[in-house]
Design a protein with these regions (language model features):
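Alpha-helical transmembrane segments of multi-pass integral membrane proteins
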Residues: 29-50, 101-102, 124-202
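Cytosolic nucleotide-binding catalytic cores of signal-transduction proteins
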Residues: 217
Length: 217
């Protein structure tokens, strides 16, 4: 398959990126609430990248297992939304809301695991696209409130704006569309674009994430 070697390399690079950054965030002191959420989110993405690496072994790559893991891959969209919602509305996220947002993903996954009914996939992908669009709208409208929060709580706020949101939204769209496409039509180049876009997405979010060192005393 064309581009497969490059996709293998980018898979490993993405795993190292998510693993290293999540470790640094979760072991850093002092650590803010948003950094803890970001660290846990990136740790989950690291596990997803590790899962892809393990699937390179033919003995593990069965059709039912691959399809089942595709449903779990979709959970990454929910994980990303947790961070974005918390970033634009600090203190909003709690375990009850996490379960509420994740419950549709769990329902689709359980439905497939109980039936192995392949036609569930189009409905799942459709739900993910709708969910992503709604999250983008919510985060967009919350951006001004986020800006006010930054100005009130962080120093050097004149250098912080919500321009990152446009970049992150565009990269998220590329990442999501590529993931859906490669889930249906597996290609080496498609996987490569997905891994690169996922690293770019989180690099953008990491760069704009507030740091406790910036917080006013």
């Amino acid at each position: 398959m064309e581009g497969i070697n490059i996709s293998y390399f980018m898979n490993g690079a993405a795993f190292m990126f998510f693993g290293y950054v999540s470790f640094r965030l979760l072991t850093h002191r002092p650590r803010s609430r948003i950094q803890r959420i970001l660290g846990l989110t990136l740790a989950f993405w690291a596990l997803l990248e590790l899962k892809d690496i393990l699937l390179y072994f033919p003995s593990l790559k069965t059709e039912r297992l691959v399809n089942s893991l595709l449903f779990i891959d979709g959970w990454a969209v929910a994980a990303c939304s947790f961070y974005l919602l918390e970033l634009t509305a600090p203190g909003w996220l709690n375990w009850k809301k996490v379960f509420s947002l994740l419950s549709p993903y769990l329902a689709f996954t359980i439905a497939y695991l109980c039936t192995f009914y392949a036609p569930i996939f189009p409905f799942y992908f459709g739900f993910i696209l709708i969910y992503s669009a709604i999250i983008v709208l919510i985060v967009t409208f919350a951006a001004r409130r986020y800006q006010r929060y930054i100005r009130n709580n962080y120093s050097y706020s004149e250098h912080i704006d919500v321009a990152w949101l446009k970049k992150a939204t565009f990269i998220l769209a590329v990442c999501l569309v590529t993931w859906v496409y490669t889930s249906i039509n597996i290609t080496g180049w498609g996987d490569t674009i997905y891994y690169i876009s996922s690293v770019l997405l989180w690099s953008c979010l990491l760069y704009t994430s507030p740091s406790p060192r910036d917080k006013r005393q």
